[in-house]
């Protein structure tokens, strides 16, 4: 069955996001097949930084200024520095059409992003960000062009051929994701100790949460990779797709080596040919204690694990073991 190429790979049963304020989030996903932590971490990082859409200033027009190499009387920063500061304004904007924003201020004082007058569908996310500083008697008026896009667009590409004199193009940093880092560690699943654990830190400009950013990046990868799938997935027979009505708890189909038992306890169960939880719970305490090298400490450990699942030793299970137990275990694995 070709489906086994992807169906039998382990998938994370733990995907947790922890937010730290408006702009920072941490993702932990485990377990992953060996090597998949690096594969997924690197792919997600690249897409997060390059391919998500956001808003940015594309051009600015400053009253009395003809080009970016000018200076403005009474303004401490020259126009080049002002343009660099404008690049760092964090913006959230709905819609795809270009919008205008205006700021007008008299000195003395500092001009910040919070001084900008915006329309209803534009939000300044870092209003404390400094644009320039005015001396006594100085005045400045700037009009910004804002657009939506993705990635990084240099000023030259924002320069329109029919642009009026004095319209200064700006490098546009559209990506709402500012920083992404990740690390891969070993993690345990059952008795397997070398699965991957992916930890990722995401910092955004506040226009999107880290969790949503990862979801969008994953969807982009899913869409891009889908074009390489050159086959239709084989259809199972109708009777195979129908879920068999079980006479017992599906959790009994879970293998005991997936329980987080000590090595000693796990080896004792293996030596006694106890493969599934359904095999285990039918044993009595006395039967377990007669198992070679199995002591009271191992017994208490197993009783505690079973109790956490609502089970205990000495249970009667009708119709156990079922026919095709391995197929049933795979079919019901999402239910335990």
Curated annotation (Swiss-Prot):
SMART domains cross-referenced by the UniProt entry: RPOLD
E.C. code: 2.7.7.6
Pfam family, one: RNA_pol_A_CTD
Broad EC category: transferase
Keywords: DNA-directed RNA polymerase, Nucleotidyltransferase, Transcription, Transferase
GO CC, any one term: cytoplasm
GO molecular function, one term: DNA-directed RNA polymerase activity
GO BP field: DNA-templated transcription
Sequence segments annotated as region (Alpha C-terminal domain (alpha-CTD)): 248-336
Span list, region Alpha N-terminal domain (alpha-NTD): 1-232
Coiled coil feature spans: none
Catalytic activity entry: RNA(n) + a ribonucleoside 5'-triphosphate = RNA(n+1) + diphosphate
Gene3D superfamilies (alphabetical): 5' to 3' exonuclease, C-terminal subdomain, DNA-directed RNA polymerase, insert domain, RNA polymerase, RBP11-like subunit
Assembly and binders: Homodimer. The RNAP catalytic core consists of 2 alpha, 1 beta, 1 beta' and 1 omega subunit. When a sigma factor is associated with the core the holoenzyme is formed, which can initiate transcription.
Functional description taken from the UniProt entry: DNA-dependent RNA polymerase catalyzes the transcription of DNA into RNA using the four ribonucleoside triphosphates as substrates.
Family in the record: Belongs to the RNA polymerase alpha chain family.
Domain-level remarks: The N-terminal domain is essential for RNAP assembly and basal transcription, whereas the C-terminal domain is involved in interaction with transcriptional regulators and with upstream promoter elements.
Full protein name: DNA-directed RNA polymerase subunit alpha
Organism name: Rhizobium rhizogenes (strain K84 / ATCC BAA-868) (Agrobacterium radiobacter)
């Amino acid at each position: 069955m070709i489906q086994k190429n992807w169906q039998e790979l382990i998938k994370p049963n733990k995907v947790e996001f922890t937010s730290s304020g408006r702009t920072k989030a941490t993702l932990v996903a485990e377990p992953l097949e060996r090597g998949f932590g690096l594969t997924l971490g690197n792919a997600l990082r690249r897409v997060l930084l390059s391919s998500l859409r956001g808003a940015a200033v594309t051009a600015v027009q400053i009253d009395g200024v003809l080009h970016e190499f000018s200076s403005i009387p009474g303004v401490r920063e020259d126009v080049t520095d002002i343009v660099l500061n404008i690049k760092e304004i964090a913006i959230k904007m709905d819609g795809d059409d270009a919008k205008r924003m205006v700021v007008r201020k008299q000195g003395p004082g500092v001009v910040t992003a919070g001084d900008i007058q915006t329309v209803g569908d534009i939000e300044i996310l870092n209003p404390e960000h400094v644009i320039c500083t005015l001396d006594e008697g100085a005045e400045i008026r700037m009009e910004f062009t804002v657009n939506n896009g993705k990635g990084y667009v240099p000023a030259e590409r924002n320069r329109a051929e029919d642009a009026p004199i004095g319209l200064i193009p700006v490098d546009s940093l559209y990506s709402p994701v500012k920083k992404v880092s990740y690390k891969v560690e070993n993690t345990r699943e059952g008795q397997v100790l070398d699965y991957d654990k992916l930890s990722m830190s995401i910092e955004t400009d506040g226009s999107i949460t880290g969790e949503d950013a990862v979801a969008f990046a994953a969807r982009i990868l899913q869409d891009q990779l889908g074009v390489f799938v050159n086959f239709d997935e084989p259809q199972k027979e109708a009777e195979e797709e129908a879920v068999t009505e079980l006479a017992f708890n599906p959790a009994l189909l879970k293998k005991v080596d997936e329980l987080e038992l000590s090595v000693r306890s796990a080896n004792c169960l293996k030596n006694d040919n106890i493969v599934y939880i359904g095999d285990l719970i039918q044993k009595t305490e006395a039967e377990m204690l007669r198992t070679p090298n199995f002591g009271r400490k191992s017994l208490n450990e197993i009783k505690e694990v079973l109790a956490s699942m609502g089970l205990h030793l000495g249970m009667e299970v009708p119709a156990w073991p079922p026919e095709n137990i391995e197929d049933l275990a795979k079919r019901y694995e999402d239910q335990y």
